[in-house]
Regions:
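Mature catalytic domains of secreted/periplasmic carbohydrate-active enzymes
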Residues: 1-158
Length: 159
């Protein structure tokens, strides 16, 4: 994180080019499986505002799209390999999925999903209208209500 400066991050230029290309919306990853947040979440320190970039990149992105009249899309993964309660043993894409030392003992999935819901609520309330939200990832027995999917989806109607 100490080298992440986002010096080439230019959502205003991207938005202008997207509009010129005839695009109607753009989707940016707010958080991917590694758990690093491009927004200023109050629920983790693993975020862009704790890097040399030092600013909320999602906020800049949302503002740039709106200036160009484009719809705002956010990609947000359900997985967070960085969170201590995320159950990575059995996740078929986690880099340490087959290592017994990364077992799920002492992991509290309800605590993890509360963290997940809190971050989704931040995305859906801190940036105004989000036109598209793409919740990524389910696998094997980790589908739908195992994640409590209706709760984060309900936040999309708050704005």
């Amino acid at each position: 994180m100490k080298e992440f400066d986002a010096r080439d991050y230019n959502p205003k230029q991207w938005a202008k080019e997207a509009k010129a290309a005839g695009m109607k919306y753009v989707v940016l990853t707010a958080k991917h499986h590694d758990g690093f947040c491009l927004f200023d979440s109050k629920y983790t320190d693993y975020k862009v505002t704790n890097t040399p970039a030092g600013r909320d990149l999602i906020k800049e992105y949302v503002e740039a799209l709106r200036e160009e009249g484009l719809k705002v899309g956010i990609y947000f993964t359900l997985l967070d390999w960085h969170h201590p309660d995320y159950p990575h043993y059995g996740d078929r894409i986690h880099p340490m999925r087959n290592h017994k030392e990364c077992g799920n003992e002492n992991r509290d999935f309800s605590r993890y999903t509360e963290y997940l819901y809190n971050q989704v609520e931040e995305i859906c309330t801190n940036y105004g209208q989000i036109d598209i939200i793409w919740f990524d990832f389910s696998y094997d027995d980790m589908r739908g209500e195992k994640w409590g999917a209706t709760k984060p989806v309900s936040y999309t109607h708050l704005t």
